[in-house]
Amino acid sequence: MVKVANKYAKALFDVSLDTNNLETINEELTVINEAVKDKIEQLKMVDSNPTQTAEQRRELINGVFTDINPYIKNMMYVLADNRHISLIADVFKAFQSLYNGHYNQDFATIESTYELSQEELVKIVKLVTQQTKLSKVIVDTKINPDLIGGFRVKVGTTVLDGSVRNDLVQLQRKFRRVN
């Protein structure tokens, strides 16, 4: 179903670019995603209900999403018509990926054993932007005592691991190769 969500996201992204609505649509999709992320199971029930017509699903969209961008509403109608309303979170994720790629930015999760100071965060973000060649990094921080010390950064599929735990694991691997 991810491929299907990617197609919806790409179509909406292209329309957003063509109509100079990229920022507005991204903001509205973010709000919609927050509103429905805990309701995916209910949306799956709507999708799979054989007694509900496409018109009834469209009425549901009109009732829930009263004042949204017409391009998003049209996409929601297509999702409803094809019984894919429950894919909205996947569509959002795929749209975010396209949006971030367009602006050469991405989300980064920085894990450390303690709460990092603003100065430390700035240094780490600078390192991450240099390593990944991104123009902007949107940061989420987490405290992870398992790291023992240092930090670990996850950006997409890239992991920059400067933790003591990683150093110990690497050292252990070297010792095993020697024996």
Swiss-Prot record:
Annotated GO MF terms: proton-transporting ATP synthase activity, rotational mechanism
Keywords carried by this UniProt record: ATP synthesis, Cell membrane, CF(1), Hydrogen ion transport, Ion transport, Membrane, Transport
Pfam families: OSCP
Cellular location(s): Cell membrane
Keyword Phosphoprotein found: no
Membrane topology: Peripheral membrane protein
HAMAP family tied to this protein: ATP_synth_delta_bact (MF_01416)
Functional note: F(1)F(0) ATP synthase produces ATP from ADP in the presence of a proton or sodium gradient. F-type ATPases consist of two structural domains, F(1) containing the extramembraneous catalytic core and F(0) containing the membrane proton channel, linked together by a central stalk and a peripheral stalk. During catalysis, ATP synthesis in the catalytic domain of F(1) is coupled via a rotary mechanism of the central stalk subunits to proton translocation.
Protein name as catalogued: ATP synthase subunit delta
Keyword S-adenosyl-L-methionine attributed: no
NCBIfam families: ATP_synt_delta, PRK05758.1-1
Phylogenetic placement of the source organism: Bacteria, Bacillati, Bacillota, Bacilli, Bacillales
Organism: Staphylococcus aureus (strain MRSA252)
